């Protein structure tokens, strides 16, 4: 069902998209470090909580992508369009609720999770969380629209929009931190703007009737509880599974917050560098949904198993190679961050430990469940 050329055409843009995201994310953290360790600590605390929120929204997008891929595999285009419309409805409702809760209760949430952190860190975190909370609806519709394009194997579209989002983000951060000297707000506002632009552009593209699957107003604004139930049947278990994993990371970060600002900053720095080793496996997480979903929709279960094993093998090899490269370049990478010697030391240890376990466990923990 998928030739090697088809797989490369699907996966390579996803890998490039992940490379862009990791490079920009690391560059963001480097720039934030110049605003002080309180700033980078505050941002890292919120990013860890936001990771949990984004994981849940991504699970919803994945649920929709699975259903759409199955319909495409079974040549049911109209049902695929209906599923796409209901995916957007569910995404808007879920992300809207999350946005309101995070914006209204940001101080209470942060004090509950990270109350032992220094006051300067919490103030930075509150500012960052309040502003970026308004980006969740845009990020939600971006993820869902991008999932539709991946279902159609048009990953080049998501790559280009991701590039646009990342360029806006990194340029805005540079202006906010180095020109306007706006500190944490100088990082938060570009994040909001870049996600808003990406969400609007991606959704507008998804309404184009030239695509194999596209959004129709009648499918978005109607109530199709049966279709929504099918999406949620996949999305909810996925959200619980990945959400619990993300919650574990949040709880670990809340423990780290008790140790001091240097440790929080080191955790934030390590978190951005950690992503380098899992670039390929993260791209495979997205590709697996499309490949396996279409095979299952066409009742080709043997092929689904074959492709899954093939993609997991690539994930293991790529993660091992990237892990070695990160280890070799780690002193040079960490020297880019404007942090204390203590923070540098802790970050070094965290990256080393993460990459050891990621090489062994990441493909089975994420590729296989997808």
Predicted regions and their residues:
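N-terminal transmembrane alpha-helices
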Residues: 2-30, 34-35, 51-63, 67, ...
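Alpha-helical transmembrane segments and their lipid-water interface positions
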Residues: 21, 25-28, 32, 54-61, ...
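Helix-terminus/linker motif at the lipid-water interface of multi-pass membrane proteins
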Residues: 23-41, 110-119, 175-182, 243-276, ...
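Small-residue-rich hydrophobic transmembrane alpha-helices
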Residues: 40-100, 139-158, 253, 264-330, ...
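Small-residue-enriched core segments of transmembrane alpha-helices in multipass membrane transport
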Residues: 162-169, 272-273
């Amino acid at each position: 069902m998928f030739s090697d050329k088809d797989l490369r055409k699907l996966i390579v843009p996803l890998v490039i998209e992940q490379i862009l995201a990791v490079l920009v994310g690391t560059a963001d953290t480097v720039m934030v470090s110049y605003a002080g360790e309180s700033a980078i600590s505050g941002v890292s605390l919120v990013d860890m909580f936001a990771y949990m929120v984004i994981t849940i929204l991504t699970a919803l997008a994945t649920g929709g992508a699975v259903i759409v891929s199955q319909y495409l595999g079974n040549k049911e285009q109209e049902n695929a369009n209906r599923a796409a419309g209901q995916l957007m409805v569910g995404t808007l409702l879920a992300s809207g609720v999350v946005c309101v809760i995070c914006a209204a209760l940001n101080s209470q949430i942060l004090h509950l999770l990270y109350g032992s952190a220094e006051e300067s860190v919490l103030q930075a975190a509150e500012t960052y969380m309040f502003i970026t909370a308004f980006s969740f609806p845009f990020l939600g519709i971006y993820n869902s629209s991008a999932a539709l394009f991946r279902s159609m194997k048009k990953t080049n579209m998501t790559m280009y929009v991701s590039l646009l989002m990342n360029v806006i983000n990194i340029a805005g951060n540079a202006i906010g931190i180095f020109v306007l000297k706006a500190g944490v707000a100088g990082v938060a506002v570009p994040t909001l703007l870049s996600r808003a632009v990406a969400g609007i552009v991606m959704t507008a593209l998804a309404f184009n009737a030239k695509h194999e699957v596209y959004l129709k107003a009648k499918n978005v604004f109607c109530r199709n509880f049966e279709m929504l139930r099918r999406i949620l049947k996949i999305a909810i278990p996925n959200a619980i599974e990945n959400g619990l994993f993300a919650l574990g990371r949040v709880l670990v970060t809340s423990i780290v917050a008790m140790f001091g600002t240097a440790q929080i900053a080191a955790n934030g720095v390590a978190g951005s560098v950690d992503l380098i080793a899992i670039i390929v496996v993260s791209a495979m997480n997205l590709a697996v949904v499309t490949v396996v979903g279409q095979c299952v929709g066409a009742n080709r279960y043997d092929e689904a198993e074959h492709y899954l094993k093939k993609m997991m093998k690539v994930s293991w090899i790529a993660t091992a190679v990237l892990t070695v490269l990160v280890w070799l370049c780690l002193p040079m990478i960490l020297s880019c961050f404007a942090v204390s010697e203590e923070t540098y030391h802790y970050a070094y240890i965290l990256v080393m430990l993460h990459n050891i376990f990621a090489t062994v466990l990441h493909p089975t923990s994420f590729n296989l469940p997808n």
